[in-house]
Amino acid sequence: MNTFICSALICLSWLPGFIQARVLTKKLTITYAKGAPDGIERDMIFINGQFPGPDLIFDEGDDVVINVVNDMPFNTTVHWHGLLMQGTPWSDGVPGLTQKPIEPGESFVYRFKAEPAGTYWYHSHSRATLLDGLYGALWIRPKENVPMPFTMISNSSDDLSAMERAAKNPQLLIVSDWSNFTSWQYIQGLVASELDIFCVDSILLNGKGSSYCPGQRLLESELSAYMNYAFGGANITDKGCFPFVESTEGPYLPGNQSAIPDHMWKDCVLGNGSNETIYVDPEEKWVSLNIVMASTMKSVVFSIDEHDLWLYELDGQLIEPIKYQWVTMLPSKRYSVLVKLNKTPGDYTIRLPDQGFSQIISGFATFSYKGGQDIGQTTPWVTYGGQNASDQGNGSGLTDLLPAPFPALRPRNTSDVFFVYNLYRWNAAYTWSLTGAAAMPVDDWAYQPLLYNPNSTAAHDKSLVIRTKYGQWVDLILQVGSKPDERQEINHVIHKHSSRAWQVGSGSGIWNYTSVDEAATLHPELFNFENPPYMDVFATSFEGPSWLIMRYQVTNPGPWLLHCHSEIHLAGGMAGVIMDGVDRWPTIPPAYAPNATGHYPLV
């Protein structure tokens, strides 16, 4: 190990951005073995022998060196979700774009600058193996004296000191959904049935949870009037899974339900897993819970009985704080909340239901005060099905969480170029297109990454690829509901690799403007150029045809993925490529040449 560190220090001088900074080295060994997070055993992925993987904590500006060893029987890569990767596109971890897969028995060294500060995560980006457990939390501690927005919460000096302490020492939490089927089995179920299956067995917190099978009567009582109407009288299953109807499958029915594996969609199996306990000390007065939403397909409502949540960071970006009683968390996003520890010391239930638009299911955990006593049942903010349980509660929804960044960050008022993406199903219920022109095949360019082939035919494929120039301001317009036979599109969560973007506008209907400037002039009420949200994951609406606009500046040349972070949608082709800054394509160091793996020669 000492030799490895020495070699890295010697060679870092010629890598962009790796000069005169602390170098931190980590080793992640990925294995495939039996495990039972919710009490039901299956094959799954472990990182350094644990699930989820170990928390990775760095200081802002650290130079990070991570040796990923693949001891699984199949290939993989690791993506560092939300990190900028300025000048290091070869470490973004996307097969076919920035690297070749890490084959069984081989390793790959990722090198990058720890920036920007905030809450992130790392996960697989090969096929759909996120379903198998390859993920972990990542936190970058901000530099000293960074302004924090806590005076918007309280003016008390005691509160402010406690909140600052809490933010510097957060508890990292990972919320995820879990299926008792491997990713291969799940995808085979989609293909064989020709149906879009989005059903899981449990909701986990820090890799712990269970399946509950509460009974048909309770499950049906939790359905909203909207969902009952959408189902047209069809019933949900005893797992809380939704029926195969036009509102869930589009025009691609009937499919072949008999090809769905037993227990994947119905016939609930009761688990015997254990739930997580989060311990807090009331003498600290406040705690920061930095939550990674590592789900593969579910949006989950997070709440702590009888406690308020002050959301102060979203997707790693500080925001003007918002007080909620529950927060709806979308796949791949990160939510940091401050919780005041002023209740009677005891155990309070953390509730983690699906938000009610894809399954009736819930997970649970315990929020436990040090020195607490038995206080009995605590009062919930939300129900098992994610519905409001109290007239006093207030929470965020699927698409209405659009906070202002802190401090204010403004994009340019105009852009240089815009691209329209039409998001919809692609010739089947379980395949998808991001661009509206093609579905992106899984691992299609895996062994010919576009980083090394920026002028190839694939890199000029306009059905999947856009090309920009350095310094341009770019608008990405995400349109849903544009297919005449499927006006009501499923909600999508779109992640942009590398730099964040501003959501500068959104509206209903079909985008039919010649420019964003024209749309903003005609409908100024639909746009925000003063303090728009600044994020790396964006949520489209499911309420009929609608559009939203992501704006960013090209400052980091490379091949970056734009994709839906529902894992089954990504596996079904919902992705595209942004070839940013093609006029200033990066020079690739020898350690990351086409057949290299990031290792330096030992000296």
Swiss-Prot record:
Broadest EC class assigned to this enzyme: oxidoreductase
Glycosylation sites per record: 75, 155, 180, 235, 256, 272, 275, 388, 394, 413, 455, 512, 595
Disulfide bridges in this chain: none
Its biological purpose: Multicopper oxidase; part of the gene cluster that mediates the biosynthesis of dinapinones DPA1 (or (M)-DPA) and DPA2 (or (P)-DPA), biaryl dihydronaphthopyranones that act in concert as inhibitors of triacylglycerol accumulation in mammalian cells. The first step in the pathway corresponds to the biosynthesis of dihydroxy-decanoyl-CoA by the fungal type I fatty acid synthase (formed by ORF4 and ORF5).
Keywords: Copper, Glycoprotein, Metal-binding, Oxidoreductase, Repeat, Signal
Residues the entry annotates as binding Cu cation 2: 81, 123
Temperature dependence: Optimum temperature is 50 degrees Celsius.
Residues noted as binding Cu cation 3 in the record, renumbered to the chain: 125
Residues annotated as domain Plastocyanin-like: 30-144, 173-353, 450-581
Similarity field: Belongs to the multicopper oxidase family.
Free-text biotechnology note from the record: A mixture of dinapinones A1 and A2 at a ratio of 1:1 or 1:2 leads to inhibition of triacylglycerol accumulation in mammalian cells, suggesting that these compounds might be interresting to treat obesity. This inhibitory activity is mostly provided by dinapinone A2 but is potentiated by dinapinone A1. Dinapinones do not affect diacylglycerol acyltransferase (DGAT) activity but enhance neutral lipid degradation together with induction of autophagy.
Single Gene Ontology MF annotation: oxidoreductase activity
Catalytic reactions on record: 4 monapinone A + O2 = 2 dinapinone A + 2 H2O; 4 monapinone E + O2 = 2 dinapinone E + 2 H2O
Residues making up the signal peptide according to the UniProt record: 1-21
Ligand binding (Cu cation 4): 495
SUPFAM superfamilies given in the database record: Cupredoxins (SSF49503)
Pathway listed: Secondary metabolite biosynthesis
Domain of life assignment: Eukaryota
EC number: 1.-.-.-
Stated pH dependence: Optimum pH is 4.0.
Name listed for the protein in its UniProt record: Multicopper oxidase MCE
